[in-house]
Amino acid sequence: GSLVKLVSTLLSLVPSLMKG
C-alpha cells in the first residue's frame, strides 16, 4: 500500500541526509 511507497521514499532520502 502507501506504506511501501513511504518507505521507498525514505530510503531514497537517507543517502542524501547521511552525506550532509
Swiss-Prot record:
Record's keyword annotation contains Secreted: yes
Subcellular location: Secreted
Keywords in alphabetical order: Amidation, Antimicrobial, Oxidation, Secreted
Primary localisation category: secreted
Tissue-by-tissue expression: Expressed by the venom gland.
UniProt keyword annotation of Transmembrane helix present: no
Recorded GO CC terms: extracellular region
Post-translational modification: The peptide spanning residues 2 to 19 occurs in 3 forms and has been given 3 different names. U1-PONTX-Dq3a has an amidated Lys-19, U1-PONTX-Dq3c has an amidated Lys-19 and an oxidized Met-18, and U1-PONTX-Dq3b has no modifications at either Met-18 or Lys-19.
Modified residues (Methionine sulfoxide): 18
Lysine amide: residues bearing it: 19
Protein name per Swiss-Prot or TrEMBL: Poneritoxin
